[in-house]
């Protein structure tokens, strides 16, 4: 498949997975009964409060559906790009991609289960941590519940600026940012996910040797939470879609080889990184600084081996 067609496929599916994740997060937040959650927190029933949030796999069905649809679309596109093979005088062989083939079905089942398990387990740990920290700090049960769920937007009806949906690490970063705002710590101006539109407000407080008031800190903190959730959605979309699309492309080639439409030695794979700061050094273009594998070419059944053998 041509490189531009492949990038178009990625550009088409990443936004869909991003939105599927955000929809799942908002659905979880909106489905929680606030009064019941507050009651459980007030009673100190942490385990029951975590369960009340309702992190069942069904809430993420749109993500698994998107994964399946993207996988099939990539397989179909790859197969269409493979030229038919001449098998006899006047006859050619041109097969269709089979997303129900055992290897394809096994991959989709494994990847879907792993994706949802990783998200839900991290969320449960994060929710528990928020609840425990809230109770230990003496915050009111309703305030703790609101930290998790966010507040309902009067226009959209959705609960926004909650901690649900963020990773545990992101939740910790958010707490640190809130502390920096409250104490006038200059480190608040170095947070990558902050909204720079509020920098002057923060600088004024620092110059006056004070922290931001609760009212002053509300908007920059909410903007930080909003951006953090988008970063989380972007990361999931990028990882899951690229992984699924590459796996589907590989499976399509294997199906074509098995059917006799292609010979294995006709296929070469080239490692292409994003070539930005997020790419690990061993996956970059090899130069005087990096001994990476970007640009390396291998056959269909050959492994890419980095200098560190990872």
Region spans (language model):
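N-terminal leader/targeting and assembly helices and adjacent pre-domain segments
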Residues: 1-226
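Acidic, glycine-rich two-metal-ion catalytic cores of nucleic acid-processing enzymes
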Residues: 213, 220-310
